[in-house]
């Protein structure tokens, strides 16, 4: 606090350039060996050279599809792969990954193993006998559901939820989603239902706050209260 940010920005730029010189192929858009995590974490951390972001994301989606949407990552990938697929136009591919029920997957834990909490590792074997069965290690899937399906997000430019971003994704195969967040300013709620070929979105914004509701290429700014939109 109170220190000039310029030296830290310079250091960050130097590190970004170093990573890109060593690991990035600007012609192919591949980082390192092109794994799911390598592609996604570069996007997530903002180190991809300007103008190359979509190329890197396209390569990410290619490797995900080549792996038949199986999860090939740990902690860092669980945080970045679904989120970056969604950011760059591949939300349906992210959804396929998240709803997989064959191991390794979150769905396998629920449907086959009957877990109601998240284990520490994808595979619990005798050598991992001390692993936790209640671990947040792979918990970012819950954040993805809140941020991308329900679409409840904070605005980094307006801290403290003075301004809120509602950016739901109406993914195929789902007819109802609801998310709520008890912010410091009150309850934020986003719910959508698909009926008769249309989607009805109901959003509640706390008193004294504003929000941008973004669906596709349409953005509408609203104030506090409950707002019902049909798409």
Features from the language model and the residues they span:
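Catalytic cores of carbohydrate-active enzymes
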Residues: 1-129
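Non-catalytic C-terminal accessory modules of carbohydrate-active enzymes
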Residues: 9-10, 14-17, 92-231
């Amino acid at each position: 606090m109170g220190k000039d940010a310029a030296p830290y920005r310079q250091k960050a730029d130097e590190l970004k350039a170093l990573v890109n010189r060593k690991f990035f192929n600007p012609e192919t858009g591949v980082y390192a060996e092109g794994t799911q995590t390598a592609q996604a974490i570069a996007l997530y951390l903002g180190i991809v050279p300007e103008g190359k972001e979509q190329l890197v994301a396209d390569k990410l989606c290619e490797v995900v599809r080549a792996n038949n949407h199986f999860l090939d990552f740990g902690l860092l990938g669980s945080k970045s792969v679904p989120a970056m697929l969604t950011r760059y136009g591949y939300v349906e591919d992210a959804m396929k990954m998240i709803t997989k029920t064959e191991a390794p997957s979150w769905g396998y834990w629920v449907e086959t193993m009957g877990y109601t909490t998240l284990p520490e590792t994808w595979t619990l074997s005798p050598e991992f006998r001390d692993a936790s069965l209640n671990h947040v290690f792979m918990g970012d899937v819950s954040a993805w559901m809140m941020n991308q399906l329900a679409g409840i997000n904070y605005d980094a430019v307006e801290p403290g939820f003075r301004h809120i971003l509602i950016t739901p994704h109406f993914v195929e195969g789902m007819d109802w989603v609801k998310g709520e967040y008890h912010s410091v300013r009150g309850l934020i709620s986003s719910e959508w239902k698909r009926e008769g070929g249309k989607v009805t979105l109901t959003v509640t914004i706390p008193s004294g706050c504003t929000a941008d509701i973004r669906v596709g290429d349409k953005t509408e700014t609203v104030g506090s209260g409950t707002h019902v939109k049909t798409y």
